[in-house]
Regions:
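Basic, Lys/Arg- and aromatic-enriched nucleic-acid-binding interface segment
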Residues: 87-89, 102, 106-169, 176-177, ...
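DNA/chromatin major-groove-contacting recognition/catalytic segments
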Residues: 136, 192-198, 304, 325, ...
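N-terminal helical hairpins
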Residues: 1-20, 34
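N-terminal core-binding DNA-recognition domain of tyrosine site-specific recombinases/integrases
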Residues: 19, 31-110, 122-124, 144-145, ...
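C-terminal secondary-structure termini that scaffold catalytic or DNA-interacting sites
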Residues: 178, 191-213, 219, 223-226, ...
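Short, basic (Lys/Arg/His-rich) helix/loop patches that form interaction surfaces
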Residues: 79, 83, 138-149, 159, ...
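Proline-centered turn/helix-capping motifs that create local helix->coil transitions or kinks
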Residues: 101-110, 173-179, 217-233, 268-274
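Short, polar N-cap/turn motifs at the start of nucleic acid-interacting alpha helices
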Residues: 173-180, 306-326
Length: 350
């Protein structure tokens, strides 16, 4: 009775329907209040249904305790989920429960605790070394199977474009004479529930291209013509895509990654056979994605001591901290190399 009196005094709702509200129902109410892009909404709902709905979703909101949330995060962590995945789920739970606090359904947000102790640390995506990059590009160039992708990879390394920006490029975006690439959209492939379609977003910048990149674009146009890949298919008002499948439709991000994985597998198989014949240890390439290609491009530019603000602009980084991380990493490696060289020098002079 004292609790009821306090609830009434503090204006905490005591309606029966409110008391029976589950976390799943609260999430539905929360999503109804949000103005979201279709792709974002589908991603949120899918994450909830796959990860939360049957785990803690049926617990009544008024009975949900911080220990429930912590135990759930611990379970995800033990199952091998990364910190980023748990944080994604937390970013769904926390605001929904905060809305319940604002609506006076509960007094405190049970998700109001640190999640830093949960989840596997994200694996650091290392850029390819100069040697690895050269070996990869040379293998592609000499391959009878993959050589048609050589211009695309040259452009990826030379521009640092995001995969979505790369596959979204149209020939209208390319100015060979001025040596510029107009980046004002990217192509994102999402399953929106009612079938798969493309979504255009707009990170806007105009980036310069090197002579090598300009030559690669010219070569890509020839390849498209020779392979009859220059058909005009329109996607959300865009047509004349630079990189397409045989159908004329733009490449998919997972398609680009699949090609990269297949090339690395083929290279490593060849390298292992060659190493056996030469009686040496095989120097395999690591499995890497289009995102690592972008990180590699950023690293090469930073290694040339490109002005950090210029590099931030070229890469389209929203925050300069992201760009600075690359510079700091390079600086750290340089310091290590100098120390090793110093030790070698001391050993030789001993």
């Amino acid at each position: 009775e004292k609790q009821i009196a306090k609830d009434m005094e503090d204006n905490i709702l005591t309606d029966g329907a409110i008391k029976k509200m589950t976390l799943n129902t609260l999430f539905e109410r929360y999503m109804a209040t949000r103005e979201l892009a279709d792709t974002t909404r589908v991603s949120y709902v899918r994450a909830w249904e796959n990860r939360v709905k049957d785990e803690i979703g049926n617990i009544k909101v008024v009975q949900l305790l911080p220990s429930h949330i912590k135990a759930y995060y611990a379970k995800l962590s033990k199952a091998g989920y990364a910190y980023s995945t748990i944080k994604y789920i937390h970013n769904l739970l926390y605001p929904a429960l905060e809305m319940a606090v604002d609506d006076d359904i509960i007094r405190k947000n049970p998700a109001k605790s640190s999640i830093s102790d949960y989840g596997k640390p994200a694996e650091e995506k290392e850029a390819l070394t100069v040697s690895q990059q050269e070996k990869f590009m040379e293998f592609v160039k000499q391959s009878n199977v993959y050589n048609t992708y050589y211009p695309m990879f040259t452009i990826m390394i030379g521009t640092g474009l995001r995969c979505g920006e790369l596959i979204g490029l149209t020939w209208k975006d390319i100015n060979i004479k001025a040596k510029t690439v107009n980046v004002d959209h990217q192509l994102i492939y999402k399953n929106l529930g009612d079938g798969c379609k493309f979504h255009i977003s707009t990170p806007n910048r105009i980036i310069p291209m090197t002579q090598e990149v300009a030559k690669a674009f010219e070569e890509q146009r020839k390849i498209n013509f020779m392979l009859a890949k220059d058909k005009s298919i329109e996607v959300d008002g865009y047509s004349g895509f630079v990189f397409t499948a045989k159908s004329g439709r733009p490449l998919m991000p997972n398609g680009v990654n699949s090609v990269l994985y297949n090339i690395v597998d083929a290279y490593n198989k060849t390298e292992v056979e060659r190493a056996k014949k030469e009686h040496r240890k095989a120097e395999r390439l690591p499995k890497f994605s289009a995102h690592v290609m972008r990180h590699t491009a950023c690293t090469r530019m930073a290694e040339c001591r490109m002005d950090v603000k210029v590099l931030q602009y070229i890469m389209g980084h929203a925050h300069i901290d992201v760009t600075m991380e690359v510079y700091n990493h390079i600086g750290e490696l340089t310091r290590i190399e100098k120390e090793i060289a110093r030790l070698d020098s001391m050993a030789l002079n001993a």
